[in-house]
């Protein structure tokens, strides 16, 4: 797993969307091999099909491709599919691994014509490597500086025509010059429960799990719209079914297994519920700053803000305001409490008791 904010929580939570130990080998076996097998993201699939087919008809390489979206939605799988559809080799690396321009130059020099270079977390690439990448993307060449000081010379090196596929969970963190060099950008959205159920049934077949349709729906509804989480929960439910039952995953077995792992019917885990409880019971529903809220639940502010909060906002449990986080009416109801009359009704960023004209004020604590 990449060293992102989140600490030990990411390692223990079954509903963390980040890649954790134990996911890698199994995820590889579950990945779809072509666009036809890829479930969900219909608009992205259609767009990519046109881009790739057009390039093959012209006999050239397609434009560089940027895939953006939250973790666990299939960006790496899509990069592998792009290479497979083109009949090309895939070279994989990540932004944090490219610390120096020389790291990138070494990788580019080993490419052959038509290769697909996949850079995960491309928003974290070091600036010297990024600047070298500009020229490689546009002109398929790089300038390697030899020596130091006044005697340094720049040697141009040709790079075989290739397609760069970049993946990012934070497209806003990309510099403008880098973003502009991608000819096609696709944003991957969260999945519908029905799509996740299809993914679960497919994964169950590959893993040899006897999964009933109702059980698949139960797991899908708790997977936060994320295939990685769905497949992880499937493995945990499989363990429960094999150890405490006859190995067949029914709806009742799935419900009992997910209760053991503290994943409720909305997909909330221990930390999510702790944040909601603190916000409502300790701070009267807010507003409260994220740092104060993190202290109340015994976690780092980055964990609350980057790991926990996005799903709670999307689920309509928390609203972000200029004065802090506010519990919505849905959060009060989720905790079995009666919401106050002035409770916020949505999880988007809202203004509380302020005029409409200030709705788009960029301030955010």
Swiss-Prot record:
Superkingdom, natural source: Bacteria
Span list, region Large ATPase domain (RuvB-L): 1-191
Protein's UniProt keywords contain Cytoplasm: yes
Region (Head domain (RuvB-H)): 265-365
Example GO molecular function: ATP hydrolysis activity
Enzyme Commission number: 3.6.4.-
Keywords: ATP-binding, Cytoplasm, DNA damage, DNA recombination, DNA repair, DNA-binding, Hydrolase, Nucleotide-binding
Catalysed conversion reaction: ATP + H2O = ADP + phosphate + H(+)
InterPro entries: AAA+_ATPase (IPR003593), AAA_lid_4 (IPR041445), DNA_helicase_Holl-junc_RuvB (IPR004605), P-loop_NTPase (IPR027417), RuvB-like_N (IPR008824), RuvB_C (IPR008823), WH-like_DNA-bd_sf (IPR036388), WH_DNA-bd_sf (IPR036390)
Binding locations of Mg(2+): 76
Chief location bin: cytoplasm
Alphabetical list of SMART domains matching this protein: AAA
Record NCBIfam families: PRK00080.1, ruvB
Domain note: Has 3 domains, the large (RuvB-L) and small ATPase (RuvB-S) domains and the C-terminal head (RuvB-H) domain. The head domain binds DNA, while the ATPase domains jointly bind ATP, ADP or are empty depending on the state of the subunit in the translocation cycle. During a single DNA translocation step the structure of each domain remains the same, but their relative positions change.
Function: The RuvA-RuvB-RuvC complex processes Holliday junction (HJ) DNA during genetic recombination and DNA repair, while the RuvA-RuvB complex plays an important role in the rescue of blocked DNA replication forks via replication fork reversal (RFR). RuvA specifically binds to HJ cruciform DNA, conferring on it an open structure. The RuvB hexamer acts as an ATP-dependent pump, pulling dsDNA into and through the RuvAB complex. RuvB forms 2 homohexamers on either side of HJ DNA bound by 1 or 2 RuvA tetramers; 4 subunits per hexamer contact DNA at a time.
Family per similarity comment: Belongs to the RuvB family.
Assembly with partners or alone: Homohexamer. Forms an RuvA(8)-RuvB(12)-Holliday junction (HJ) complex. HJ DNA is sandwiched between 2 RuvA tetramers; dsDNA enters through RuvA and exits via RuvB. An RuvB hexamer assembles on each DNA strand where it exits the tetramer. Each RuvB hexamer is contacted by two RuvA subunits (via domain III) on 2 adjacent RuvB subunits; this complex drives branch migration. In the full resolvosome a probable DNA-RuvA(4)-RuvB(12)-RuvC(2) complex forms which resolves the HJ.
Protein's recorded name: Holliday junction branch migration complex subunit RuvB
Organism: Rhodococcus jostii (strain RHA1)
């Amino acid at each position: 797993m990449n060293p992102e904010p989140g600490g030990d929580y990411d390692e223990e939570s079954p509903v963390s969307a980040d890649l954790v130990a134990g996911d890698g080998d199994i995820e590889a076996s579950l990945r779809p091999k072509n666009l036809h097998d890829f479930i969900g993201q219909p608009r992205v699939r259609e767009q990519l099909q046109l881009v790739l087919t057009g390039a093959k008809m012209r006999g050239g390489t397609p434009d560089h491709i940027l895939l953006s979206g939250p973790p666990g939605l299939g960006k790496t799988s899509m990069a592998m599919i792009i290479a497979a559809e083109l009949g090309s080799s895939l070279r994989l690396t990540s932004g944090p691994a490219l610390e120096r321009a020389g790291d990138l130059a070494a990788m580019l020099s080993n490419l052959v014509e038509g290769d697909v270079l996949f850079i995960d977390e491309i928003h974290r690439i070091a600036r010297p490597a990024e600047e070298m990448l500009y020229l490689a993307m546009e002109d398929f060449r790089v300038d390697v500086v030899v020596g130091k000081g006044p005697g340094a010379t720049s040697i141009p090196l040709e790079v075989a025509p290739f397609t760069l596929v970049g993946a990012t969970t934070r497209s806003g963190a990309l510099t403008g010059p880098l973003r502009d060099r991608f000819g096609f950008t696709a944003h991957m959205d969260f999945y519908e429960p029905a799509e996740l159920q299809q993914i679960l049934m497919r994964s169950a077949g590959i893993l040899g799990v006897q999964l009933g349709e109702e059980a698949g729906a139960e797991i899908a509804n708790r997977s936060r719209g994320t295939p990685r989480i769905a497949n992880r929960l499937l493995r945990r439910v499989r363990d429960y079914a094999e150890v405490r039952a006859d190995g067949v995953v029914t709806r009742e077995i799935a419900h009992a297994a997910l209760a053991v792992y503290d994943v409720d019917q909305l997909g909330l885990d221990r930390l999510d519920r702790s944040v909601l409880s603190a916000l409502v019971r300790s701070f009267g529903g807010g507003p409260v700053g994220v740092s104060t809220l993190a202290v109340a639940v015994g976690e780092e502010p980055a964990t609350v803000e980057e790991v926990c909060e996005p799903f709670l906002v999307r689920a309509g449990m928390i609203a972000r305001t200029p004065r802090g986080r506010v519990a919505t009416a849905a959060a009060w109801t989720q905790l079995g409490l009666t919401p106050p009359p002035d409770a916020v009704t949505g999880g988007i960023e809202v203004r509380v008791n302020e005029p409409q004209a200030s709705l788009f004020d960029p301030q955010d604590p």
